[in-house]
Amino acid sequence: MILKTSMLGQIYEFKDVKDVLAKASEKKSGDELAGVAAESKLQRIAAKEVLGQLTVEDLRENPVVPYEEDSVTRIIQDDIDEEVYSEIKGKTIQEMREWILDDTTDSDKIMRASKGLTSEAIAAISKIMGNMDLILAGSKMHITATCNTTIGTENVLAARLQPNHPIDGVEGVTASTLEGLSYGSGDAVIGLNPAIDTVDSTLAIWKTLGDIRDKYQIPTQTCVLSHVTTQMEALRSEQGSADLCFQSIAGSEAALSAFGVTTEMLEEAEALFKEKGHAKGPNVMYFETGQGSELSSSAAFGADQQTMESRCYGLARHYHPFLVNTVVGFMGPEYIYDTKQLIRAALEDVFCGHLHGLPMGCDVCYTNHMPTDQNDSEAILTLLGTAGVHYVMGLPQADDIMLMYQSTSYHDVASVRQLLKKQPIPEFKEWLEKWGFWENGHLGRNAGDPSVFFTK
């Protein structure tokens, strides 16, 4: 394993595989904050050159957090398909990149190979790809998952309807939900971040969203994004009724601990929701991630934030989720500084999620102190649509009045669908057409008019 190279008369040498991964990463303010980023463009190029010549085996044998010390590492390593791994372990990262991008390599071939790749290897492949590579490769991979409906079928761009409310008010949540439905959002999930993380609040919102779904016979799934332990306690109660179990996850055991979560807890939640939940299909978990969360809890172990993010996906695939999405700008400019970094992180995350075999979505968002704006979000949303992202977020005017950040709007989702000739999930599309919200591949005559729910 060679960890040095010569470039323009200068020798660049790296301490270990973790250092190569970090120095090969595209510029991120979080990596600079952590002191692991490349010190120059030439050093970054040199690291990419070294990384490209490492093998799949080199990456597996050198996880960024030791196997003996970390439950996330153990899950990633133990889930590897040894037969597939034996076939590709001698391939270099550069060879894997070229093979994935080859026109003769289809989704089925990539998905089989992915079972032999650790999260570090997947991160490595992404680090030597340009943005166009990430878009092209991401769009080649087709992954489906089923809760009440199936996400990931051909030419579908789904949307999470996010009807958040500052006090979890039933009337406000209902109004926002009906408006979002009238614009065609909500086929991925109707999912609310509660302002109050209690069992009673979770039960109340489950009932509110469930009543709307049942009253109007909407083919979708609902979710309340309270802590996993809150959801489990709520589901065990007599009033408990849910489709999906949500939890934010991270790429190390220590970072999970900062969220109040363990891998055993996630296994318990998956089993409970399969037993007592109302999902018709086998995929009952919903995970959110985001570059920088491990660093923010001092649990990155000297690794770069994109490699740690990839490890989130290695953890996620263990639980066969229905939905996974990166909340790409939510951590703020301390981790993702500006639009350039936001674009790169979004494309990296969707590609790495897909190469893990996940139905990958993205919350294209930013905090109010980032040097970016809605025009940038709309551009990124369009890029992700071409990259095959499974779903994005639909919020009223792209403004979350509870979490106080900016995302993408109901109108944005409809526009990208029309532009790229994408459709909602088929059963949901049929439901929209019945109500006049969707016609001939775009918004219909009743779009944006939730009053029709009270006149039929």
PLM segments and residue spans:
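N-terminal small/glycine-rich loop or linker at the start of catalytic domains
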Residues: 66-72, 141-165, 284-298, 360-362
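Glycine-rich, proline-tolerant flexible connector loops at the mouths of alpha/beta enzymes
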Residues: 112-118, 122-130, 189-206, 327-340, ...
